[in-house]
Amino acid sequence: MLTDMDISRRAPLKDIAVLGAEFGLLPDEMQLFGKTKAKVDLRVQQRLAEQQQGKLIIVTAVTPTPHGEGKTVTTIGLTQSLKALGNKVCACIRQPSMGPVFGVKGGAAGGGYAQVVPMQELNLHLTGDIHAVSNAHNLGAAAIASRLYHETRLGKAEFELQSGQNYLDIAPNGIRWHRVVDHNDRCLREIEVGLGENNGPAYTSGFDITAASELMAILALSRNLADMRARIGKLVLAVNRQGAAISAEDLGVAGAMTAIMADAVKPTLMQTLNGAPCLIHAGPFANIAHGNSSVIADDIALKLADFVVTEGGFGSDMGFEKFCNIKARQSGLTPSAAVLVTTLKALKANSGLTSDADINAPDQARLEAGFANLNWHINNVARYGIPVVVAINRFATDTDAELNWLIEAVAGTAAFGCELSEAFSQGEAGALALAQTVMRACEQPSEFTLLYPDDMALEAKLSTLAEVGYGAAGVSLSEAAKLQLQELSALGYADLPVCMAKTPLSISHDPQLKGVPQGFIVPVRELVLNAGAGFITALVGNVMTMPGLGLVPGYLKIDIGADGEITGLG
């Protein structure tokens, strides 16, 4: 079989202006970037404000493993198959961060014959949205550091006299706003800034990956440009000596930060291998942020398509949970059905049983033990009140006997249906049965339900997420988290939803606990207010907001020839 890159290169692409017109966009609603991609102007939201919405489908997965479950492959494959069945359909996915592209995970365009193309353009830069987020974020960091410098240098009276601005009285070590970069770079996790003569005062800070920036979450959750501007104004950059928050609005930098992101607020239109439209927008990670593409992209797609297929990062305890309790809660755009992706390899890897056998080899004992993980995720999705269809992403090494056993086992669960998907090897033809079952699921009566109400106490939300969302015995808060809990409640932020930042490699907080862990306590070490994004992040265990590169990073495979052709992506 051809490589992903070769398939992408050989694909007969439709001119993006033609594809956009067929999708329902007007010429002045598209800002073209060559013939392969276009920004979608938000004026289309106003034109289609009264348009009836299509059906929203959210794709999620079992607990991820190093073998790859094929969630994006299934998302794109399902989109292609829905189109092949005569439906007007659109996929909405996140823009890949270059950190994972050059790290371990690789690209995020799908794979095989279920891809967004050209895949090299999607995986590297695209239309520059992530760079805009990085620059806007770092402007905020430079602005608050500069303000601290000038206030310290001049004192209150002289500062106000010379600058004409209010003295913010920034506390020593009161700056909360890190800098960001779109790479995995562990040595930047903790740094000292302001060292040297006339550069200070010095304080401890650090870098996060851009996907972890609150600005990225704001981009993904904003309804329009005005909403994004208002949210950016609420960003908490520092605290003063009295402990009160200093916002981007207080600093006077919110307008400039928003201006940098003026084009980033527009989704990017691309296409799948069979010419289905795909809107790419925003890229928050699901382990350290809320892990879903933008509300704006969903809103536009739902007004133009019969079916919209989107995905949440990692397993259903991560991106799907945050899709429901953060994204859908804020946007009001709720799903009609969910697709839960699994593989034989994933279930064996999640079995908790050790084996020297090849993961591709038949192993009924491991498969049966790992089925508990799939059943947990089925029940987890079903508790939100929507029908769930299990998609078994078939690999060439899978045996019919094990596949048939799994299909029969799923029939005894809460799943609406179960279908094999061979979209990777067969493209649109490989997921037709899945598409038909998903269409039937979308017609079922459903009542979307949140895990907790807005007015639940903040500590109770944490407990509910841990106990109901993960099956934990409870939560434990560090002393710092206990103080932060009191502060956030006193300041009136207890009505915000919670975004758990934890490992994706287990339903629990511990990546070593496989299958369906029980009796564990979720350790919350820190609570972080994201006033602009509208949620509170609970940092759990040892999760990092700046990843590091592995021993054998992905960039080792990537090169470019004299003809300009990039190799090694995928």
From Swiss-Prot:
Belongs to the formate--tetrahydrofolate ligase family. This is Formate--tetrahydrofolate ligase. It holds the Pfam family FTHFS. Pathway: One-carbon metabolism; tetrahydrofolate interconversion. It is an enzyme of class 6 (ligase). ATP binds at residues 65-72. Gene3D superfamilies: Domain 2, N(10)-formyltetrahydrofolate synthetase, Formyltetrahydrofolate synthetase, domain 3, P-loop containing nucleotide triphosphate hydrolases. Keywords: ATP-binding, Ligase, Nucleotide-binding, One-carbon metabolism. GO terms for biological process: tetrahydrofolate interconversion. NCBIfam families: PRK13505.1, PRK13506.1. GO terms for molecular function: ATP binding; formate-tetrahydrofolate ligase activity. CDD domains: FTHFS. Its EC number is 6.3.4.3. It catalyses: (6S)-5,6,7,8-tetrahydrofolate + formate + ATP = (6R)-10-formyltetrahydrofolate + ADP + phosphate. The gene is fhs. The keyword Nucleotide-binding applies.
